[in-house]
Curated annotation (Swiss-Prot):
Protein known as: Gastrin-releasing peptide
Localization annotation: Secreted; Cytoplasmic vesicle, Secretory vesicle lumen; Cell projection, Neuron projection
Keyword Secreted appears in the UniProt entry: yes
GO terms, molecular function: neuropeptide hormone activity
Gene encoding the protein: GRP
Principal cellular location given in the protein's record: secreted
One GO process term, biological-process aspect: mast cell degranulation
Residues carrying Methionine amide: M50
Cysteines joined through disulfide linkages: none
Biased composition (Basic and acidic residues): 112-128
Xref: InterPro entries: Bombesin (IPR000874)
Keywords, alphabetical: Amidation, Cell projection, Cleavage on pair of basic residues, Cytoplasmic vesicle, Mast cell degranulation, Secreted, Signal
High-level lineage: Eukaryota, Metazoa, Chordata, Craniata, Vertebrata
Propeptide residues according to the Swiss-Prot or TrEMBL record: 54-146
Family recorded in the similarity comment: Belongs to the bombesin/neuromedin-B/ranatensin family.
Length: 146
């Protein structure tokens, strides 16, 4: 034997001597076919329940404790909410109307309301890429496409 083959033969002998058994523990009674397929239980809800927290920390969960203490806690939250609302209304933030936005610039209409057929003369404009703009010498000409 060569030196490289010896560790492989030794590994094969060790693996043959290892006890064979199920990868996951199965109940002694054997159980049904589904119990053998899912030895740790049914996993249909695993993805559905991921990230869910315990309801014990929720203020809305019924703890079965003292009703007077729960009522006091509710009244404290209600008072805190009222105080916050009054502070917001005092600053003017609590109004139900949406904020009035200022226009970005003063916009003037280009339409002459007295003469409904013409646009207002906006003064001379520049020529861009061979096309004439209103107010230029070539105004009114139809550009030719090549």
């Amino acid at each position: 034997m060569r030196g490289r083959e010896f560790p492989l033969v030794l590994l094969a002998l060790v693996l043959c001597q290892a006890p064979r058994g199920p990868a996951a523990p199965v109940s002694v009674g054997g159980g049904t076919v589904l119990a053998k397929m899912y030895p740790r239980g049914n996993h249909w809800a695993v993805g559905h329940l991921m990230g869910k927290k315990s309801t014990g920390e929720s203020p809305y969960a019924y703890e079965g404790g003292n009703m007077k203490e729960q009522l006091r806690e509710y009244i404290r939250w209600e008072d805190a909410t009222r105080n916050l609302l009054s502070l917001l209304e005092a600053k003017g933030i609590g109004s139900h109307q949406p904020p009035q936005w200022e226009p970005l610039g003063i916009r003037q209409s280009t339409w002459d309301s007295k003469d409904g057929s013409n646009f207002k003369d906006m003064g001379p404009r520049l020529k861009v890429d061979g096309l004439s703009a209103p107010g230029s010498q070539h105004e009114g000409r139809i550009p030719q496409l090549n």
